Amino acid sequence: MQSVDPQVVGVGKQFVEHYYGIFDSNRAGLTQIYQQQTTLTWEGKFLSGADAIVKHIVELPFQQTNRKINSIDCQQTYQPGIMITVTGTLIIDGEAKNQLKFVQVFNLASNNGSFLLINDFFRLVLD
């Protein structure tokens, strides 16, 4: 049985750590991650382009977020790129009662030795 390339997993985990570090400390700083060609589907709402995406994220109705990551799965894609699926719990405004399970999928495309975020999907997992 083949396994996933450890380098792919390493890049994926580094991206996730970097992304959530910015999301949880300064959402407006996500302009350095999202591109003009990036698309985001956030809870069924489709957004395109860095400006629209970051505006939506900055305007979310909570101030502070932290998260507990349950799993990070990475897989190399055809381009070559990396598909990353994250599951976890989102903790809103530091409140134990405000914990929501989520899944997020990132699609990174290779670009001259680095990676660009091309697609992002975010969905809460409601019971």
UniProtKB/Swiss-Prot annotation:
PROSITE patterns from the UniProt entry: NTF2_DOMAIN
InterPro entries, alphabetized: NTF2 (IPR045875), NTF2-like_dom_sf (IPR032710), NTF2_dom (IPR002075), Nuclear_transport_factor_2_euk (IPR018222)
GO cellular component, one term: nuclear outer membrane
Stored SUPFAM superfamilies: NTF2-like
Subcellular location: Cytoplasm, Cytosol; Nucleus outer membrane; Nucleus, Nuclear pore complex; Nucleus inner membrane
GO biological process, one term: protein import into nucleus
GTP-binding keyword on record: no
Domain of life of the native organism: Eukaryota
CDD domains in the record: NTF2
Entry GO MF terms: small GTPase binding; structural constituent of nuclear pore
Record keyword Heme present: no
Pfam families assigned to the protein according to its UniProt record, in alphabetical order: NTF2
Domain NTF2: 11-124
Keyword line: Cytoplasm, Membrane, mRNA transport, Nuclear pore complex, Nucleus, Protein transport, Translocation, Transport
Job description of the protein: Mediates the import of GDP-bound RAN from the cytoplasm into the nucleus which is essential for the function of RAN in cargo receptor-mediated nucleocytoplasmic transport. Thereby, plays indirectly a more general role in cargo receptor-mediated nucleocytoplasmic transport. Interacts with GDP-bound RAN in the cytosol, recruits it to the nuclear pore complex via its interaction with nucleoporins and promotes its nuclear import.
Protein name as catalogued: Nuclear transport factor 2
Origin organism lineage: Eukaryota, Amoebozoa, Evosea, Eumycetozoa, Dictyostelia
Gene designation: nutf2
